Swiss-Prot record:
It comes from Homo sapiens. This is Probable inactive ribonuclease-like protein 13. The lineage of its organism: Eukaryota, Metazoa, Chordata, Craniata, Vertebrata. Residues 1-20 form the signal peptide. Transmembrane segments: none annotated. One of its GO terms (biological process) is defense response to Gram-positive bacterium. Its main location: secreted. It comes from the Eukaryota. SUPFAM superfamilies: RNase A-like. The keyword Transport does not apply.
Length: 156
């Protein structure tokens, strides 16, 4: 009986944190897929007053948060085309406490930026469609999934 209890305690101590981390990575990857990828690009009804207003309304509802994020990036490319960049993450981004990488290719992206000319109780966004490289946050160093976007690459 004692060896079985010892084995169970060992598994809980060793594998418990691993299982929690794996679940956290799966949730991060799923949230990224749901909130940061729109492929093919969706057309929202005119009642939303533009692409970003429809998308950000959906995003705030999905996150159950009424705050207006200042900026949000949406990638218009297939999951596989984005996921490949996290096969090997060459850097650790301390500001985000995550592994990160710069995409090797430019991707079609919509930048949704909060408009400064708005009443404080509403969220109105400007849309900018661009084709750029970006910094992806990855779930781990090797064979990872994207879990966030740190920003756009502004270099040459």
């Amino acid at each position: 009986m004692a060896p079985a209890v010892t084995r169970l305690l060992f598994l809980q101590l060793v594998l418990g944190p691993t299982l929690v981390m794996d679940i956290k990575m799966q949730i991060g990857s799923r949230n990224f897929y749901t909130l940061s990828i729109d492929y093919p690009r969706v057309n929202y009804p005119k009642g939303f007053r533009g692409y970003c207003n429809g998308l950000m309304s959906y995003m705030r509802g999905k996150m159950q948060n009424s705050d207006c994020p200042k900026i949000h990036y949406v990638i218009h490319a297939p999951w596989k085309a984005i996921q490949k960049f996290c096969k090997y993450s060459d850097s650790f981004c301390e500001n985000y406490n995550e592994y990160c990488t710069l995409t090797q290719d430019s991707l079609p992206i919509t930048v949704c930026s909060l408009s400064h000319q708005q009443p404080p109780t509403s969220c109105y966004y400007n849309s900018t469609l661009t084709n750029q490289k970006l910094y992806l946050l990855c779930s781990r160093k090797y064979e990872a999934d994207p879990i966030g976007i740190a920003g756009l690459y502004s270099g040459i």
